[in-house]
């Protein structure tokens, strides 16, 4: 059976309503998608890192409960598992504050088993982070050599929009690795200053990857190929 392998950050989200803690749940861009697949019974592995602490235990237990393999999760002894505080307004929109304390050596995990036509998912700032880039490229090269389908979701948020020009070479390299690129109109507005999906595809994506999916909230989905 085809497997899905993802790489990215997982973080414990502590959610506040009316300035009071309401609940705490692990989250993350790639992580959330893999959790949904695990609940459906799809064979899923997640490459990530958490601290050797109580928060790390919570995250790993949550993964196991939702059928995600923890074999490729690095438990670093130095530093602490990342957390975020999510303050919800009356419309349930969140304002985030992040707390991270990673060690110098990161993602100290073996290469996962990948077979032809397995799906390898990568994205968000985690795939662009200079501190992780060399290791990220190792995984991308390996997935491509193993003939996996590489699926890239930039998940490029407004908080990083001011870095778009600086990160452009790495973004384009991620485009080159991808067999499928999927993102929201907001992602590409933050990257290119352009939300028109056809122009984004024609001017920025098609040269690197000809399979392109954009989402528009209530406005639906566009597919280009």
PLM regions and their residue ranges:
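Conserved phosphate/ATP/ADP-binding segment of small-molecule kinases
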Residues: 146, 160-225
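Short beta-strand/loop segments at the ligand-binding rim of alpha/beta enzyme cores
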Residues: 147-154
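Conserved N-terminal subdomain of the carbohydrate kinase-like
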Residues: 43-124
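Glycine-rich phosphate/adenosyl-contacting loop at the front of the ribokinase-like
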Residues: 1-69
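Glycine/threonine-rich flexible loop motifs
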Residues: 18, 22, 128-134, 161-164, ...
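Anion (oxyanion) recognition and catalysis
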Residues: 38, 64, 141-145, 175, ...
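Active-site beta-loop-alpha junctions enriched in small/polar residues
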Residues: 101, 125, 155-159, 186, ...
């Amino acid at each position: 059976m085809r497997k899905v392998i993802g790489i990215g950050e997982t973080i414990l989200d502590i959610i506040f309503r009316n300035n009071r803690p309401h609940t705490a749940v692990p989250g993350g861009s790639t992580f959330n998608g893999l959790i949904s697949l695990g609940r459906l019974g799809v064979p899923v592995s997640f490459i990530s890192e958490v601290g050797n602490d109580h928060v790390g235990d919570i995250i790993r237990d949550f993964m196991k409960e939702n059928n995600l393999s923890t074999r490729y999760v690095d438990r670093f002894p130095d530093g602490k598992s990342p957390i975020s505080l999510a303050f919800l307004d009356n419309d349930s929109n969140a304002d985030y504050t992040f707390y991270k304390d990673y060690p110098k050596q990161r993602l100290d995990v073996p290469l996962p088993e990948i077979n032809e036509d397995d799906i390898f998912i990568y994205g968000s700032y985690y795939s662009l982070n200079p501190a992780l880039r060399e290791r990220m490229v190792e995984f991308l090269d390996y997935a491509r050599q193993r003939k996996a389908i590489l699926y890239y979701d930039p998940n490029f948020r407004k908080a990083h929009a001011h870095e778009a020009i600086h990160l452009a070479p790495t973004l384009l390299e991620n485009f080159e690795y991808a067999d499928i690129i999927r993102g929201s109109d907001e992602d590409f507005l933050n990257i290119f200053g352009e939300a028109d999906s056809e122009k984004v595809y024609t001017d920025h994506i098609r040269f690197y990857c000809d399979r392109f999916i954009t989402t528009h909230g209530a406005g639906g989905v566009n597919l280009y190929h």
